[in-house]
Amino acid sequence: MRDEAAAADPGTIKGYHAHVYYDPASSRDRAERLRSRIAADFPEATLGRWHDALVGPHPQSMYQVAFPRALFATLLPWLMLNRDGLTVLVHPETGDDYTDHSAHAVWLGAMLPLRLEVLRRTPRE
């Protein structure tokens, strides 16, 4: 049976976020090294604050890396090879936070249970 729904337009993606998860007691040093390498190799990326306390839907300490669409094809493979055992969630920014963090997400490493109920849902037009 063929699905008659229109395909989603990738042009709605405004950019991407990568959330790098770490444990403050045991893996923050690796997260710091990764962060420094991202800053050096991808100056177009914007590094967010360190969040040792839980924030939003995230079940573990993390920092965010925001990056433009043009960087996706380079930064994602780089993270695959250089994440040093850290878990990374990569998702698009379409305006639908719930779906971006769930159905549209790519996980590198262990998939963590997000608290999706705190995210805004935006119906697709």
Regions found by a protein language model. Give the residues of each.
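Long, contiguous binding/interaction regions
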Residues: 1-125
